A protein has these predicted regions:
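Conserved phosphate-donor/acceptor-positioning beta-strand/loop module used by diverse small-molecule
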Residues: 88-106, 144
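Single conserved hydrophobic/aromatic residue that forms the stacking wall/gate
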Residues: 160-169
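Conserved substrate/cofactor phosphate-moiety recognition/catalytic segment
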Residues: 16-59
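Conserved nucleotide-sensing/catalytic segment adjacent to the nucleotide-binding pocket
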Residues: 49-80
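Phosphate-binding beta-loop-alpha motif at adenosine-nucleotide cofactor sites
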Residues: 139-149
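Short glycine-/polar-rich loops that comprise or flank the Walker A/P-loop
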Residues: 56-57, 86-91, 137-140
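Switch/connector loops and helix/strand junctions flanking conserved nucleotide-binding motifs
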Residues: 70, 99-106, 132, 151-152
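Extreme N-terminal, non-catalytic leader segments
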Residues: 2-8, 50
Length: 169
């Protein structure tokens, strides 16, 4: 007996959050969990990755405010488009972190915050948190990373991206 091939939906996880909250760690963790991982993909290319004939079963895409065409409005528009794709189930994963921890992480790496414009990291972080607030409000999954180690973040990604709610604990 031959069974017809099931049309499986692509599971898409969009990962966003302020710089320093763990987006790259989350993307790498999702890759370790079997997702095709793409970090810093421009918003205008997301749909091309999701063509039914080319799509992987599980895809994780990191979205960075520093991206070439990133805008909050653009991402919110993309979410509307994705919700109409019958072959894709998507979730928006937002990584949150306290100002204190973000400042500490920046001082440890001695990197300039991308939105600081030569000013203090605090100013850049404040700008980014305000910019990302509408995205945070749309998140399906919110992970507070302030007290998480990279291993803990990977475990959280596993918990929240399991195939079914029953597997999520």
């Amino acid at each position: 007996m031959v069974l017809p091939k099931q049309n499986k939906k692509t599971k898409l996880i969009l990962v966003s959050g302020p710089a320093g909250a763990g987006r790259t760690t989350a993307i790498r963790s999702l890759e370790d969990l079997g997702f095709e991982a793409i970090d810093n993909l421009p918003l205008d290319l997301v749909q091309s990755v999701l063509k039914p004939e080319k799509t992987s079963e599980n895809i994780a895409i990191g979205l960075d405010t520093r991206g070439r065409d990133f805008s909050v409005e653009g991402l919110l528009d993309l979410l509307k488009v994705l919700s109409n794709l019958e072959h894709v189930d998507f979730e928006l994963l937002y990584l949150s972190c306290t100002m204190e921890v973000l400042l500490r992480r920046y001082s440890e790496t001695r990197r300039r915050h991308p939105l600081a414009n030569g000013n203090s990291p605090h100013e850049g972080i404040e700008k980014e948190l305000m910019l990302l607030e509408p995205i945070r409000n749309k998140a399906d999954i919110l992970i507070e990373t302030s007290d998480l180690t990279p291993h803990d973040l990977k475990a959280s990604c596993l918990l929240y991206t399991s195939p079914s709610p029953r597997d999520r604990g």
